[in-house]
Structures are given as structure tokens and as C-alpha cells.
């Protein structure tokens, strides 16, 4: 047996509790929710957080293992990006949330076309910024580019994603909002 050094990635304790039954139940329910929905109308979104963590350390693990996780409550955040795409491979413009009180012009100097840029104190998406993403990027795309019929939006189950405003708009526009299990 040989071992190799890897940097562990951080995972929150509640994410480490996900069971096989949780995953099987999710996919059983998802199958029913996708019935009658065109692939062009099925979307998945996810936030990616880019960090500057000078405290990362290597650990010993088996060769061939691409990554190793370690359970930690917090990480130092720089900015977050929300990505969203359809089941047919259409990518919506991203939204970038910087950790700052004010937006600096230089951050948008080479902006991605139709991307949205915002700030929060933490650099994470919150209810306000998620609503902006939903209205300006996702709902805008649904209204202007999707086929008739039901739509599905699949993503994280963070509390800030479930504002009354977003839920009302999902109902109004025939969008089935499906939360992933903690992962």
C-alpha cells in the first residue's frame, strides 16, 4: 500500500451527514418532478466560492484519490459566482458577488456579457442577491428563451434561496423549484 499527500477540502458538518437513503429518496422524487418537462426547460444552478486560504495543509491518502475533505465550519471568502445551465447545455450568464461594501469599477472592467455583479458583507449570496440573480438572469431567460410548459430549477437548499418573492414568481411562471439534499 502506498500513500500520497493531498490537500483536504473543507466540508461543513451537516453536509457530512448525508446518507444513501437521503440520496435515493431525492432521486425518486426528482423523477416524478421531471415528468413532462422539456430538457430545454430544466435548469441546475450552483454557487462556487473562490477562497484565499493560506492555512491549507497537505494530508496523506491513497494514490489516485483526487481530493480529500476535512470538516470545518468556516473558510476565508473572497467572492462567489452563481452558475446556471440547462439540461441541453445552455449556459446562463453568471452572477458574481464580491466580499465588499462597495463595488469597484475595476472589478467589472473586463465584464462577461450580461453578467450581474453585486457585493455582500460576507461575499456569499444572501436573500437579496439571490433574488437579483433569479429576476435578472434566470427569470429573464425563462421569459425570453424557454419553450412553453413547466420549467424546473434545481439547486442548493440554502434558506436564502427560498424568499417569498422567489417562491411566488416560481408559482406565477410554472417553475418547479427543487432543492438538492445537503451535499
Residue ranges and their predicted role:
Residues 1-183:
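Phosphate-facing sequence motifs and polybasic nucleic-acid/acidic-lipid-binding regions
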Amino acid at each position: 500500500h502506498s500513500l500520497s499527500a493531498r490537500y483536504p477540502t473543507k466540508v461543513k458538518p451537516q453536509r457530512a451527514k448525508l446518507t444513501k437513503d437521503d440520496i435515493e429518496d431525492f432521486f425518486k422524487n426528482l423523477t416524478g418532478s421531471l415528468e413532462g418537462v422539456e430538457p430545454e426547460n430544466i435548469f441546475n444552478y450552483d454557487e462556487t466560492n473562490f477562497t484565499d486560504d493560506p492555512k491549507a495543509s497537505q494530508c496523506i491518502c491513497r494514490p489516485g484519490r483526487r481530493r480529500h475533505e476535512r470538516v470545518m465550519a468556516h473558510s476565508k471568502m473572497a467572492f462567489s459566482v452563481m452558475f446556471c445551465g440547462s439540461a441541453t447545455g445552455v449556459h446562463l450568464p453568471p452572477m458574481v458577488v464580491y466580499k465588499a461594501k462597495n463595488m469597484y469599477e475595476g472589478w467589472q472592467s473586463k465584464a462577461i456579457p450580461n453578467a450581474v455583479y453585486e457585493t455582500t458583507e460576507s461575499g456569499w449570496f444572501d436573500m437579496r442577491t439571490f433574488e437579483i440573480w433569479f429576476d435578472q438572469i434566470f427569470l429573464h431567460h425563462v421569459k425570453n428563451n424557454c419553450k412553453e410548459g413547466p420549467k424546473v430549477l434545481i439547486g442548493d437548499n440554502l434558506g436564502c434561496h427560498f424568499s417569498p418573492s422567489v417562491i411566488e414568481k416560481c408559482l406565477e411562471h410554472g417553475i418547479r423549484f427543487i432543492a438538492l439534499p445537503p451535499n
